[in-house]
């Protein structure tokens, strides 16, 4: 993987770049649709390519490991061969999912023992077998296995957790370097900066991660209950230290406003389930604010969902989409999910354009309040 830093904004830390992988290029800033089990909920890959303009998607190691399982994925030639997506893929290590299984997992130095949410069977994730699993899945970008402490952890717990994450990172790097890709194309490993909301720990973590010299670096453990002000502060603290010549990935974030604020602070890559999850619940993101398509106000509105949006937005009226949601038609959730994902991709593409034009901060400031309105 190669990262070419192109333009850095003169008024902020926003920047543009190009990530080159063996499955294609990714223009940053970029939003990555979440395809947890190898698919993006409600959206066919052809729609992801043509309507959403997705350049890279996510898969989740925990879910893919449990179902369909590594035997199936390996026999198919990796996740690309299994699901037919021919562009880059990033896999989360599954750490967040495993540590979300409160009451059905046990944490120790070796790794994390857990029970499947599907059938209750026992499993263990270690840094070594997670690297092996991600090799079998075959994503272009693999995430290191880390502990994801609760958002409101106290300093002592957060420090202890970070120390374990750093030891696990060393084991991940060692295993990654000892193994080879299985399918003839390059894979990259991204370490993850943890440290909860403690600047001291975030600085320590960022320095530790930066010293690994990885192809890219991630910021984890944010948007888990802390205020947006604290989240932005942690991003600033970390990005002062992470190398500028490597892509920076903010995991699991967030709203359109969060994304623009993080771009201003030097983040390049984003993922979040919000576009599809909110879409399935009739909430549409637009530059004018958020629309609840179940509201009666749209019943007689025959204007397009978004006249400046993707093809589906332009041919679908608000009244028709309102009707589909009221009738509980599956098509409603599909259209809304496509719209939201396309909007997120449009947002980061527009951000890229304004960084290139040199007016990113003015543009961001002119739209950010409206993005948060309910209409």
Q: What are these model-derived regions, one by one?
A:
Residues 129, 133-136, 160, 164-171, ...:
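A non-catalytic, amphipathic alpha-helix used as a structural packing/dimerization or gating element
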Residues 1-182, 296-298:
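Non-catalytic, usually N-terminal nucleic-acid engagement modules in DNA/RNA processing proteins
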Residues 1-20, 26-33, 41-42, 146-152, ...:
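C-terminal extensions of enzymes
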Residues 24, 57, 92, 134, ...:
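Conserved, mostly hydrophobic/aromatic
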Residues 152-155, 159, 216-222, 330-333:
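Glycine- and acidic
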Residues 139, 170, 174-177, 240-243, ...:
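Generic secondary-structure signature for well-ordered alpha-helical cores
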Residues 163-166, 175, 179, 184-305:
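Glycine-rich phosphate/ribose-binding loops and adjacent secondary-structure elements
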